[in-house]
Structures are given as C-alpha cells and as structure tokens.
Amino acid sequence: MVDVNRFKSMQITLASPSKVRSWSYGEVKKPETINYRTLKPEREGLFDEVIFGPTKDWECACGKYKRIRYKGIVCDRCGVEVTRAKVRRERMGHIELKAPVSHIWYFKGIPSRMGLTLDMSPRALEEVIYFAAYVVIDPKDTPLEPKSLLTEREYREKLQEYGHGSFVAKMGAEAIQDLLKRVDLAAEIAELKEELKSASGQKRIKAVRRLDVLDAFNKSGNKPEWMVLNILPVIPPDLRPMVQLDGGRFAASDLNDLYRRVINRNNRLARLLELNAPGIIVQNEKRMLQEAVDALIDNGRRGRPITGPGSRPLKSLSHMLKGKQGRFRQNLLGKRVDFSGRSVIAVGPTLKMYQCGVPREMAIELFKPFVMREIVAKEYAGNVKAAKRMVERGDERIWDILEEVIKEHPVLLNRAPTLHRLGIQAFEPVLIDGKALRLHPLVCEAYNADFDGDQMAIHVPLSEEAQAEARLLMLAAEHILNPKDGKPVVTPSQDMVLGNYYLTMEDAGREGEGMIFKDKDEAVMAYRNGYAHLHSRVGIAVDSMPNKPWKDSQRHKIMVTTVGKILFNDIMPEDLPYLQEPNNANLTEGTPDKYFLEPGQDIQEVIDGLDINVPFKKKNLGNIIAETFKRFRTTETSAFLDRLKDLGYYHSTLAGLTVGIADIPVIDNKAEIIDAAHHRVEEINKAFRRGLMTDDDRYVAVTTTWREAKEALEKRLIETQDPKNPIVMMMDSGARGNISNFSQLAGMRGLMAAPNGRIMELPILSNFREGLSVLEMFFSTHGARKGMTDTALKTADSGYLTRRLVDVAQDVIIREDDCGTDRGLLIRAITDGKEVTETLEERLQGRYTRKSVKHPETGEVLIGADQLITEDMARKIVDAGVEEVTIRSVFTCATRHGVCRHCYGINLATGDAVEVGEAVGTIAAQSIGEPGTQLTMRTFHTGGVASNTDITQGLPRIQEIFEARNPKGEAVITEVKGNVVEIEEDASTRTKKVYVQGKTGMGEYVVPFTARMKVEVGDEVNRGAALTEGSIQPKRLLEVRDTLSVETYLLAEVQKVYRSQGVEIGDKHVEVMVRQMLRKVRVMDPGDTDLLPGTLMDISDFTDANKDIVISGGIPATSRPVLMGITKASLETNSFLSAASFQETTRVLTDAAIRGKKDHLLGLKENVIIGKIIPAGTGMARYRNIEPQAMNEIEVIDHTEVSAEAE
C-alpha cells in the first residue's frame, strides 16, 4: 500500500481506453453473479475469483492451495491467485463494449462539455447519441454542412441525390467519437481568441465558455474522444457486495443489477452483429446499451430512472458519491471508530475540572487491550487468549489493574451536535458505579448539555501522541475561554450562582452584628454555633490574611465584612484583592478604604455609616474568573473554579430556597393600569372611526399602549419586590429566569403573536398566578407552537450555515510568523445609527498595530508600530481620546493560503499570541455558526407607514450577508462623491429624486416615495454612501468602491446582527470569512499573459501571472474583484476533493477531470479524505519531525492478533 503521509498531491483526469485496460485484471463477459447451488462466484461473471481475487484469505477457488505459504501462486486447476481476500476491494475488471457509448457526465452536465467542444447544442447531441438523427461527419464534395443533422428520411434522400459514399454521416456515440477525433484544439483555440477581440454580448459569453473547455483539454493532455467510452471499467466486487440474509435470500448492491443490464445488452449486441442483423435492430440494441451505461453511471440523469423492486430507483455510481449518504461524506469525511462508547450523562458535582466519571463495565470494555497486556505482564495469565477469558469472566483482579491502566490515560467526551471545538474535550476517567457517564457541572455550558436525558459519546485515544495531545491541548481544565469572544465559557450557573449570591448577601441588624474576630476560623465557629449570621456585618483582623494585596495604610487594622464574604474570599486566589463590592474597581484596584476601622473607632458606628452592598451575581463571578485567568492562567483558574463550584453548591443547599404560590407578589394597582390602557385604546379606536388615522397607525398605537401597560406593571413589580423573595433572588442573581418570566407570573402576559407572525391586538391581561381564561389560553398556544417550530427550523438552518462556513474557510491556517505587508485596516467603533454596537476598545484588544498610535493632544507615542495591543493598552488608547487606529488585519494579510500571526493577533481561546499551525478558518466558522441557533428567525414587519420594507434580521440576515445575496429593503447608494443639492418629490410616479453634485458631474438617483431618507440637502456624501435607510447591496458597493470598503461594510453588518442579539464574536473570525468571499478576481483583459478572459482565479495566482510579464516588459492582465457567496466560494476552491465533498459532486468532478486538476492537499478536508494527518496544529510539516518518547516503552496488543488467537 502507498504511505498516505508521503503524498504530495492528487490528480484526476479522464481515463483513456488503454488506461482502463491497464487497471483491469480480466474481462467480465457474463452477467452471472454467484451459482445458486454452490454459492460460489461464476466464471467470467461479476464476482469471478480469477479476475477479482479469492473470496477467502490465502485460498484458491477449488481448494487445492490453502495457507499463506502458497502466497502468490496461481492455481493450475482454477486459475485463482493465492492472496489476501482484501484484493477484492481493489482489483477491477472491464467490459469491452461492442459499440462506443457516450459518458453521460460530459454530455448531460451543465454546460454540456461535449456540446461546447463540438460547438453543437445539447439537443442536437441527444438526437445523434440516441439514434434519432444522423450527423454529417465528412461532407466530402457535397454541399452539406459538417455537423449538420439529417433525419432518417433526409439521409436516404441525400444518399439517392448524391450517391452512396459521396458523404459520411453516422448516428450514435460512434458519430460523436469521430467528430471529437477531428477536433483540432490548437486551431480552434486560436480562432476563438481572434473572435473574442471583436465579439460582444451572448456571442462573447459563448466564445469564452468554449475557449475555457478547449483550453482545459489542450493543457491537461486529455483527448476529447475519451469522453466516449469503448471500454467500461467494472469496480471491485467488494465495493458492490452481495450478502446472504438469514432467510437464505441475497441482498445485493444495485450496481450489480446495473452492470448486469449492460453486460446482457452488450452480449446481445455482439450476437446481432455476428448474425448481420438488420440495421434497425442493431441500432435499437445500441441505443439500449447507451441507456444501460447511462443508468450505471448516473441513473435518472436522463429520462426516467431504472427501477428495482417496488419501483425504487436504483443507486448508480454517481449516487454512491453524492450527498450525506455518499462515499465522501459518509465514509471519507466521517468514519465510525472503535474504542468508543455512549451513555446517558448524569451530574458529577464532586469531580475536579479535569475529571469525568466512567462506569466500570464501560471502562473495562474500552480499555480491554491495555488491561489484557497488564494481566500478561503481571503473569496472572500465560497468554493473551487466557487474559481475554479472564476479562470476560469478570475476574476480581481485573478491577485493580483497570484502576492502574486508566490513571493518566485521558478519554475524550463528545456531545452531539458538536457546534464548536468545545464539543469534544479530554478528561481523566474516574471509575464509578452505575451506568451513566458523570460530567463536571462547569463544562455543561461548553457542551450545551443538561441532565434531562442527554447522551454523550466517549472515545479512547490510543497512541502515545494522541494521549499527549489530548492531555496537553484538549483537557477540559485548559478550556476556560470561549474561542469566539475570549470570555470565560465555564462561568458557574444555577445552584452555584445562587449559593454564592446567598453567601455574599448583607443584612442590617442580624445576630452577631458588630462582633470582631481575630481570624476566619473564629468567625466560622461563631457562625456554626449560632452567634453570628452569615449575612451580619462583623469585623475581622486584616493581619489574619497576610497574603492578600493590602495597601500599607490598611494593614494591622480591623475590616468590616460579613461572615459569608470571609468564606467567599477564602476560596479566592491569594493575590486577588479582598472582595467587598461586586464591581471592577474592587477587583482590579483593591478593597476600598471605607471598610477599615481607624484606631479607637467604634465598629457599630462604621457599620451604620456603610450602605448595604448588593450580593455577587452571575456577571460578577464571570468578571472574577476572567481576572483570575488574566493573572494566573489555566491551572490556578481551574482549581479556583472547583472551589467556587463546591462553595456555591454547599450554600445553595444551606439557603434552602423554595418557591410557593405565596412567593409571587400581587401588584396593588394592576386594575388601575389596565383600566387606563382600556380607556386609551377606546380613544384610539374612536379616532380611527372618525377617519383621523389610518388602520396601520391605529394598530401601532394600540399595540404600543398595551406594551406600555405591561412595562408599567413590570416597573411597579421591581419597585415593590422584596430582595429576599426566592423568585427575586433567582432572577436577580442570574441563576434562572429573568424579569419577563417574573412579570408573566405576577404582572400580565401581554401581547401575543398570531400564527402569521403579526402581533395580535388583544393582550392577555391575566398572569399565571391568577390563571388564564380559556380564550387567553387559546391565544397563547400560537406563540408556544411558533416557538417550537422556530427552534427546530433554526437548528437545521444554523447547522447548514456552519457547514458552509467551515467549507469555505477550512484551508485558512496560520502559516507564518509575519507576512511583511505594508497595508493595514483603519478601524473605529462600529455604530448603528447613534447606538454603538462594538466599541473601539473591544476591537483593539489582541490586535497588532500597523502604525504607531499617538496621543491626539500631547503627540506622545502611546504604542509603537507592529506591537500587540493588550487589554490595558486598548483602554489607555481609548481614554486618550483616540477615535481611529490602523491595525494589522486578516483583510490585508499577504500570506498565501492562510494568515500570518501578526495579522491575526491573539488566539482568543488562550489569550496568548496565536501559534503557527492554528486552524483559524475552522475556528472562525464555528464561532460564527455556533451562536446561530441563538439568533431569531424572524423578518420583522414594521407595521405602519414608517417604512415599506421588511428589515431582515437574525439568522436570515446572516445568511443573506454570507451568501452575498441582494438584500431585502435595499438602500440606494451614490456613485458620486459630492454634495446633495436637491431632493424633489414626484407625486405622479410616487418617487423622489436625489441630485448629488460631484466634481465630474451630477448624479441623479430615483428613490421610492415611502423610503426613509438618510441624507438632507447640503449633506456631503462619499462614493458608496447610502442615501436611504436599508441594507447596501455588497456587489453594487464593490463596483462603486474598493474591496476593503466592502470587507469593512460586511464585517460591520455581521457584528450588528450578532450584537443586537447580545452575542459577542471577535472581529477576526468575521474577517477570516469575509476575506474568503473576496479572494477571487475575474480576468477582464489578458494582456500578454496566457490567461483566458473571464477566468476566475485567486488574487495571488493572478499577481504571479502578471509578475513575469511585467519583468519582461509586456502588457499585464487586468482584472476585477469578485464577491462570491460562501457556497459558491467553496465550490470555486482550488481543491477539487474539498469542493466535490461539499455539493454538486458530479459537476465538480466532471470539470476537474477535464482540466486534469491537481489537488495539492493544502486544506484540512482534502487530507481527511485521503487519510493523511491534517496540515494544521501538530500535523503541520514543521512539527512532524518531533519524535515523542514514552516514559516507559509499552506495547499495545493488536486486536487482529487477539481475534486470530481466539479462533
């Protein structure tokens, strides 16, 4: 076998007849498969052992030679070679066709490659190939046109008119083959290039297409006549198996039926030709043979598909490759693996961050070979066979061995759907009883797991390298930050939040207030014995906590705090300030001075002068974790998280929060608020009946009134709530629920959406405490159903979006340290109207500067060029009043097939500079796709006159942007830079005209009457600026402005959608995707290069082609940038393997074969497909020479040996 890891590239071409013969081990002459009595393959049939190899290892068909010692001998009795049965997966046969047959991919594809080569229409080709018309091949001296079609009658008439042999006309694939042989590629190409100089319109488009195909044949060395088959390869029998079912019947692959039809028809044709049968019968048989081969290659592409039993269309060779169940996606990109298991998950609150609980019986099965090796090593058993029996019997001694084996051997846990890289993490296994996997509660957020019956899969990394990578790169304790935004992903939730919230509450006048303790232990003792309450404010000696970063003025004093906060601060990392207040100042700058007693001061006096602090909420805990990570990195953070979790669980149990109906408060003035709203609605309806407002206005006014009523109730609820109310505590701490849930319980449910998405005017006035009436209940079912269907649709849509994103960016890898570009991107805060969607500070963090940044007033250099901007530096730049900064960006990176470290910046998942080899494309795709399910599905209907457009938001808008579609509610943009001089309204056409005066001339733009204007007379506008509200069409913007403007616009638009839904995503991820959409240019004028006009090519390839021409003093080619949607960009990738495994498999392969494309295996998918280690991370060439050394050399028993011995 070829060593996959030594592959440099992979090429696909058309196979010549001689090539097909060289593959073949013999001709399949009979349609038989296996003998019904002996069940042995028939000679010269589709499963023949002589052609394809033996069905049993090292055994010929007749049984004369058995055993491996006869390896390579060809049996003199049956003619079968003694070898492994595995060769039946690789040996091919062939069928000699008695008449040429056209290949349906090349004749039927769009555009038809045969048609373009011959300059004939697909319809004409079809008539010839399927024997409906003759085609003139050589008119000789007659006035007939070459390639003209003649019907049967016309052909006879012409023969009589000009005499037999005066011209050559044929039908069928044979005629096409003759025509293809006559094509003079060089002459045709020269002629077309000449024609292009003057052609325009449709004629030019057709010439460019033909030139493309002919040039492909010319350059690849493929001959056009190979598109017609004279010999048909037969794929190996094990790839179209026939298996016996329990009832003695056989199940066979559809391909066998399709091959059988071809062989039957071919043999019948051979017999007819021998008998010199009448032409019409032969013709009919040839047509049937053509149809049989068509069905074998792509059943159903032309006419009705051939069906099997139950009128089910048979699966042809093309179907074996296509779609989710095809070869590419089912077997090459995703494989089933051994050493894996799956079970329901349960919570493991006692586990450490890096541990998971694995049921004993699962672990013994997963680690079986390792356990068996240890049994033999310890001499509990003499050989592997005995060891295997010992494990299967469940001998007592195996459990101790299992404990040893799993120590330090990480396992991988995966939860489907794996939306981002945190969907697979490594843990150290801990053996547990029971049958469920135990999962650490803090990693649930990364997996999006809960314990209502979710299942997870477990995998065992086997090799030393795999174990090392799992431990160093994938251990759950290492994954503190989310790759999408660099924020902690392991924030505590629910009980943990609630426990810490309860612990850090403060209360005035509780027992023990004003007591002073010498240290933590004394305070805890007082609390345990009932002398002090958890929430009572007490004093503690600062010197009992010497490791905290106190100011000098604070040492040796007494500090006012609560018993709960003493416990809370006890689990904090030592160098973190003592936390009294849930704010950033306390966290970063230290404990405020007001909590410290001056000598001789009365503690009660200080306590009375202090405000009651709010407890620590979920958000505050997140900030503490982020700060801890920033200062101490992963090890300390994960240990701290475990302490935080334990403390939270312990105290949420102690708090004993319960919820009863009495905990839902009653709002005293609810009736008044609702009566006022009813009164206002009545007035609005009255005004409408009098004709003072339109129906749209009335609808908006009514819905607004009810919305305001609901808000008034909500406001009243917040004002009157008791902070110790359990529901309020849950809501306020961020443990569960929000104000909207609370107001539905205690206020009113409010307005509901109708099935059509429009909001109904009748609100639900009741709340859940009072209970809903039957009608109200009925109304609310619409919303509930819509919620369910939306979620289901959204999940599928979001998953497909992620798949397309991954596909377009999977080959973007950090390939070098610095690309040395001199370009940069000028960034400022992203705004939407007056609202800031993303601040400059957020955009600067973790990026490199392109130019030095100076203080706008003093001129002092804040940071030099090409320096990394840290979080603190970003704050400093913004505080200095800088509004825009030029940074290194993925958009301007000059690295080929990837990005350099400096243009990318920091890796958000680690907080450090990104490493060479990081697969940033895939991470970007996951970061954008994973929150896709959180985005809404709706297209908002803004009822009312305000706008006549539907503003697309949420997931549909993201798809619109990435697919570069024309947006709904498109804005009119100006092509002129200048001033708006006039806006005139034309009532007759219901439009407005906007006039922009530029330096070179006046621009006139027609705008719909109802569109909302963004500009006024006198405004200065730049090229590409929007005159009306709405989304700009990016392709139009590209025509008016440059690539960078389009990239910046798309980046801002994506961020607006995500930020409006409260989802934060790092700019760099969007940059990676947008850059992939703009990586191609279209050649306009080839100049002196040998490029073809109209060709799509990578910018780097285009630059290379021009470089040589410019050096030699020729005219360089000109091009225009092209914006492609992600689906099209994926299909236009340089890798045909990646494109074929994505979509439109047959089209991609047809095209690649004609061009003789070479895949240089630069991306991830291509390497996964051929089974090579991916060129990212540790698989990158620069890291491949490192030899891992095990601490103690250990051998792992091969499974095949075990099964061989067991037999």
UniProtKB/Swiss-Prot annotation:
Swiss-Prot/TrEMBL GO biological process terms: DNA-templated transcription
Cofactor binding mode and count: Binds 1 Mg(2+) ion per subunit. Binds 2 Zn(2+) ions per subunit.
InterPro entries in alphabetical order: DNA-dir_RpoC_beta_prime, DNA-dir_RpoC_beta_prime_bact, RNA_pol_asu, RNA_pol_N, RNA_pol_Rpb1_1, RNA_pol_Rpb1_3, RNA_pol_Rpb1_3_sf, RNA_pol_Rpb1_4
Any coiled-coil regions, as ranges: none
Superkingdom per UniProt: Bacteria
Claim: DNA-binding is one of the keywords in the record: no
Keyword Transferase found: yes
Residue positions binding Mg(2+): 450, 452, 454
EC number: 2.7.7.6
Molecular function, one GO term: DNA-directed RNA polymerase activity
Required co-factors: Mg(2+); Zn(2+)
Residues annotated as binding Zn(2+) 2: 819, 893, 900, 903
Principal EC category: transferase
SUPFAM superfamilies assigned: beta and beta-prime subunits of DNA dependent RNA-polymerase (SSF64484)
Keywords: DNA-directed RNA polymerase, Magnesium, Metal-binding, Nucleotidyltransferase, Transcription, Transferase, Zinc
Binding site for Zn(2+) 1: 60, 62, 75, 78
Role summary: DNA-dependent RNA polymerase catalyzes the transcription of DNA into RNA using the four ribonucleoside triphosphates as substrates.
Subunit structure: The RNAP catalytic core consists of 2 alpha, 1 beta, 1 beta' and 1 omega subunit. When a sigma factor is associated with the core the holoenzyme is formed, which can initiate transcription.
Name the UniProt record assigns to this protein: DNA-directed RNA polymerase subunit beta'
Species classification: Bacteria, Bacillati, Bacillota, Bacilli, Lactobacillales
